[in-house]
Amino acid sequence: VSVTVSPPVLLIVTDVFGNTPAIASFARQFPVPCLIASPFSGEKTQYPAETLAYHAFIAEGGVGAYAEHVAQLIEANQSSLRYAFGFSAGASALWLNSANPAMAKLQQAVLFYGSRIRDYRDVQPVCPTRLIFAEQEAAFEPAKLVADLRQRNQDAELVKGSKHGFMNPYSAGFCLKTQELFLKELLNLTQISAAA
């Protein structure tokens, strides 16, 4: 009897910039098939400035609408999903879905600087979830949020000296050194699955 096993899939949930060439390049580095979720209905959307991208994101329905879109993708691909990485609004959308039973087969979710997580601290993820916050945020104090999430037994950490957007070359807070550090960690995480 032969059993066909679905390949592991990585879900990448973008920030308000959406599916940019930088995200496509990021996804190509992983040894597993990737699915990219963007807050915009168009395949590839580009905004020359973060404020324009943010206004377009709000016009699309904000985090709530994005979380619903992400839920549909998770549910449609739950048999093959093993990893989910989210950035900013994408991290918040993933966090809102992290208690969804459809995420139970994930080996790891890694959420970068999801600022709206602060509004939903009581969520209990059904899969291992790592929360990574920038040290500097305009709207809240990340150190206090991280301390509170840790008290709730969440895997939360603060990246010293970083600003919101440190993983995205289009963001004012981008930091190549920090991006490379985390990219290496994420690649190592998915390499284990690709080798199995």
Report residues per predicted region:
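Gly/Ala-rich beta-loop-alpha elbow adjacent to hydrolase catalytic centers
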Residues: 85-94
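Active-site signature of alpha/beta-hydrolase-fold catalytic machinery across serine-
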Residues: 96-100
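Serine-hydrolase catalytic machinery in alpha/beta-hydrolase-like enzymes
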Residues: 2-79
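A conserved short beta-strand
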Residues: 103-115
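Acidic catalytic loop of the alpha/beta-hydrolase fold
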Residues: 134-141, 148
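Conserved loop-alpha-helix segment in the C-terminal half of the alpha/beta-hydrolase fold
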Residues: 143-155
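Short beta-strand/loop motif that positions the catalytic acidic residue
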Residues: 125, 130-133
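C-terminal catalytic histidine-bearing segment of alpha/beta-hydrolase fold enzymes
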Residues: 156-196
